[in-house]
Amino acid sequence: MQNFCHSVLRATLLAGASLSVTATASAQATADNAATGQPGDAIVVTGIRASLASAAKMKRDSVLIVDSISAEDVGKLPDVSIADSLARLPGVTAQRLEGRDQRLSIRGLGPDFSTTLLNGREQVTVGDNRGVEYDQYPSEFFQNVNVYKSADAALIAAGISGTVDLRMLRPLDKKDRIIAVSLRGQMNGMKKLNSDGERYGYRASATYVDQFADDTLGLALGFSASQTPSQNERFNAWGYPTDVSGNLIIGGAKPYVQSNLLKRYGAVATLEWQPSDNFHSTFDVLASHFEEEQRLRGIEFPLVWGSNVGVSNVTVENGFVTGATFSNVYGVQRNDYNKRKADTISLGWNNVIGLNDRLKLNVDASWSRAKRTDFLLETYSGTGYLRSGTPDTVRAERQSNGLFSIVPTIDYTNTNIISLTDPNGWGYNGTTAVVQAGFLNRPKFVDDMKSFRMNLIGDISGSIFSNWEVGGNYSRREKTSAYRSYFLCPAGGGTNCTVASGTPTSAPVPSEALLGSNVSLDYLGVPSMLTLDPLYLYDNVLNAAYDNRPGSLVRDNVVKEDVFTGYAKLTIDGELGGKPLKGAIGVQLIHSRQASAGTISNFANGVVTVLPVSGKDSYTNVLPSAQISVELEPSFFVKLGAAQTMVRPRLDQERVNQEFKYNLAYVGIGSSDPQFSPFSSEGGNIFLRPYQSTNIDLSLEKYFRGGGYVSVSGFFKNLTDFVDPNNNIAYDFSAVLPTLPADQRDVILADGSYVGLVKSPANTGKGTIMGVEATASLPFKLFSPALEGFGIFASGSYTHSEIEYGSNPTDSVTLPGLSKWVASGTAYFEKNGFQARVSYRYRSSFLGEVAGLSAAPTFRTAKAEGILDAQIGYEFQSGPLQGLSILLQGKNLTDQPFVTYQNDDPRQVIDYQRYGRDYYLGLTYKF
């Protein structure tokens, strides 16, 4: 199959040289216009119909396979981020986190396989890795967004699945001064789940656009401020072991009620100067600051996985325990507080210089930086330290939605029996017990990228080729990840929170920490729990001890990447058999240098020490590409693309860090199997190479008057060098033996168990992904003038993938983020100022990334979901209120929960999160 793909790619590349064509004078506007700062056709937005028409024009004129949305779509949908609107495009899906669409999958490939550009430039992210979290960008700032699904030699930093290009407004594209202000109020359909949370929010924005000096100088300014509340009824199951009868039974549960408040403030400015046809300069800046506060309160119930827990009154259905009474349960009350601060800034300066009538020089420089700090505070309370207090007896019953109702028998609001403590004695610092009455994580991430690009574009006459282009791009990226964590214990004595040093095992609940009303968990059957102010406890009651466990000390790392990209491209513009033909052939040469500095744990004299370590590597890739578009019949296009693309691994996989582990429990078990060796290590791999993909794309597109079209496209990707995150290699740890006590050393030598496993990601995977997409954008006036104003935009896709890892070559797995079936549809009416629309999107089950233990990324199967949004509005057409529009919107009207499960068994629900409906009422005034 791989040889077939390369053969097709080579044939397509050679096609341009063997065609007999007639040259035409027109020049093709290609995807690299984003980098030159010269947009294609100006978009004039007067409503959803104009927006869809301009998106259709963009799709029609491009030789690439591309889908677009315009400012009207982003500005009028009930969006929290741009991802809401992008999720309506064919083959694009969004994963909800904390009730917001944050992460995109394109053609079944998750956020790690796509890239995001701002005005054609690669961007950093506030996330842990490369995938952009789209709520870092205020959506009001963008004129249009293009999703390129096929590659072009001039499209720098393209992804395997696709490339999202966020396009800011260009003031010289507008003919008049524009001043617009908008204010929108928000209400969540659920009541406040925490008394110190918020239910109501707002969103405000202002835009100013003007032209000066005979329309040679343009200025655009934008400001945005928002406070977005959300509620979340959360349920988390620990897992489902088997009981003595072989039935699956819930191991434990962690239900919460959560209240979030996202505050975001942003500003954007664009200065554009074009004094002549031979010089065009654009400088733009975007800055965004957001803070998110989360208040979480709940109770952890150790059930069958608890210590000495009794199980009785069991009901079983098809090998699954649907109800049971658990005795000797010691619940852990949680009063948690999370705060995230993130700042993003992006600067870009583009200059296009006409050297003569046939030659242009483009020079582009940019810098982007993102900084994020997290404050993740947990506090615990219960009836006594190490199960010394009053035990609980709870009844757990599985509900029809997959949740377990949990009905306790003790009063969790009674401060006479509840204290600040470590109820189950879980605290352990790697060598001795600690009184863990809380825990604090304080990670910090800084992502910085600088880039410089220069390219020449020259016209060609009398040939199939209309122009040539050569250029180069240099980028330097550096991402720093720093982690700090602390045990929290009752104050009053001891050192380092250890039990042996005399740390108090509990502390009474201070009255100052009590909030006015207690939180209810009645959606699960818990009437109420003790509701405390965790910040008061942190500031006044609890001591902090640095978490110096080996696994915690080897997390800090820096990853640097220097990437040099050179490219050459020929643009095709002619005829084939009397049919209009456009296209391009080209190649990229990419040289990469990557380096990482971090820490590695070492074992010497029975003590684990942490040592600095660094590493580096370099490599070169060649990426050819070709695409053609033939207009076989008027307004009927066939587009074919073939390309080799790549995308770099996750940044945390490129880190050099390694954590050494020594498991005393495996000493003397009599096995030489490396899986049961006392020695192991886990970390990153600085020698990782990018994922590679050989792509074939085909699209059939028919366009109609008035902006309508239908299209069907298919794609095939042959994936190689796929990163296996679970790769293990056998390693001889015998060099460590002299540091061990003699008795342990002798047993290990006798068993031959000194060969252990080193877990490190490697490029040992391969696979394929293929699919088909269908789209219809139909204004109903095509069928009858009486239907003027009505229309639909609908799309659907089917995607299939098979990935084989070197660590498990016999079993194929699905890709993270891939839903086999995806569909979306919007029905709208817009006429004479009145507009209404209903949008629905569906995705089948997929492997989603969620936050696991200590906020570590974890993959679980997410259930299929369908989201319904709607809006209605009116814009005054004349009179004193002309320019004023009113909009009422609703989001997630189906109140669709986010649900994950494990082991391909929907009964084994792990996460259940219900966010409720959101309602918005807004005013916009333009003058």
Model-derived regions, located:
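Short acidic/polar hinge/loop motifs at secondary-structure boundaries
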Residues: R121-K149, R199
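Gram-negative outer-membrane beta-barrel transporters
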Residues: F716-N718, V723-A730, A735-V850
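Extracytoplasmic beta-strand/coil segments of soluble accessory domains associated
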Residues: A83-E122, K149
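Conserved C-terminal beta-signal and adjacent last beta-strands/turns
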Residues: F439-N441, F445, R453-D459, S466-E469, ...
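Transmembrane beta-barrel wall of Gram-negative outer-membrane proteins
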Residues: D196-N308, V314, A324, K339-L361, ...
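N-terminal periplasmic "start-of-domain" segments of outer-membrane beta-barrel proteins
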Residues: V44-L77, R103, P111-S114, R121
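Outer-membrane beta-barrel signature, preferentially recognizing the C-terminal barrel domain
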Residues: Q333-T344, R555-E561, M646-L719, G752-G771, ...
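Short loop/turn motifs that connect adjacent beta-strands in outer-membrane beta-barrel proteins
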Residues: L155, P171-R177, A213-L217, N278, ...
